[in-house]
Amino acid sequence: MTAGTRTVVLAANSLWYITNFRTGLVRALRDAGYRPIVVAPADPKNEGRLAELGIEFVPIKIDRKGLNPIVELSLLSRLSRLLRRLRPSAYVGFTIKPNIYGAVAASRLRIPVIANVSGLGTAFIRRGALQRTVTGLYRIAFRRAVVFFENADDRQLFVDRRILRPEQARLVPGSGIDLDSFVVADLPSDETIFLLIARLIGDKGVREFVEAARSLRQRMPHARFQLLGGIDEGNRTSIQKPELDAWVHAGVIEYLGETDDVRPFIAKASAVVLPSYREGLPRSLLEGAAMGRPLIATDVPGCRDVVDEGVNGFLCESRNPVSLADAMWRLGSLPEQQRSSMGAAARRKVQEQFSEALVIRAYLNALAGLQRN
């Protein structure tokens, strides 16, 4: 494999992330004359999806949640060797460890860096030694990087903590939504279904969703509350299977498992819900909005960027199942025409502010700027 002046390495902690959220960007890079090379842990299923697109893939071992310093230094070493061999014209990092260690490795080799902070995650939500450690690592890694943020709150936090300079930080509307893939579906007229799409971790507000559903059983006896997403064993706030099974057994929620295609589930839902503690720019809300679904979310960074109170949905207080239940009750009590109007407003907002084309243009412009410099 030879190095090329137009090679761009894109790295993430899972190949699933790239194939589900960044395929449009990878294709656009290829079509613009770049040679994109994706770097992530081995994943035969998603490697096949990349191969179908004719995109090169290099597997690398990443312990997504581990904090062992020896293991972390080993990852830095592997990324350094890989980038020294490929000598790309730019390194693009997604997710926390490829962002930090990839940026450090690339900077040492004088390879320009673009990093994407798609949310601050558990390390920033929960204060303490871990937050201080991650802040310090970001400060080292992003010294010379161009950094894309998905909401203004996260951008300002990094600037205020002097992790980076204001001129390094740019806003981009998430990973963008392919509006040709996510099309409007008619709202169900015969039942009310609230759908939460998320990894099963506490920080996504899963327990608040369950408690809100439990409290609404008498007021809304015919409403259904559905949970779609996989158990994230490695996360410190992960929901464990016995707890999930108890909710299902009690008839509080329906668990739909996990999927690579959320569209059929959104099409059957009346509203998409996300009671998260903090987000970058929540894709589940954007996908629901693109399909014409009213939204219910917490009034926190990321979520409030997508939901306009009373226009395309309702906001509620974070970590407050009573407030969440009230928002779901308000939406469920609306006449069908008003729900449809909210769904139409949600779709328009995605078209105007969050389309994939806007995101791709931002990355191509950033790469062109790096080439000029």
PLM features: what roles do these ranges have?
Residues 186-204, 210-214, 226:
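Conserved donor-binding/catalytic core segment of Leloir-type glycosyltransferases
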Residues 39-45, 197, 224-239:
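Glycosyltransferase donor-sugar binding loop
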Residues 330, 337-353, 359-362:
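A short, well-ordered alpha-helix in the C-terminal region of glycosyltransferases
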Residues 258, 277:
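Aromatic "clamp/platform" in nucleotide-sugar-dependent glycosyltransferases that forms part
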Residues 294-297, 307:
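Short hydrophobic beta-strand element within catalytic cores of glycosyltransferases
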Residues 58, 139-184:
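Donor nucleotide-sugar binding/catalytic pocket of nucleotide-sugar-dependent glycosyltransferases
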Residues 20-21, 70-77, 112-114, 121-143, ...:
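Nucleotide-sugar donor phosphate/pyrophosphate-binding loop at the beta->alpha transition
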Residues 308-310, 314-321, 330-336:
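Conserved acidic donor-binding segment of nucleotide-sugar-dependent glycosyltransferases
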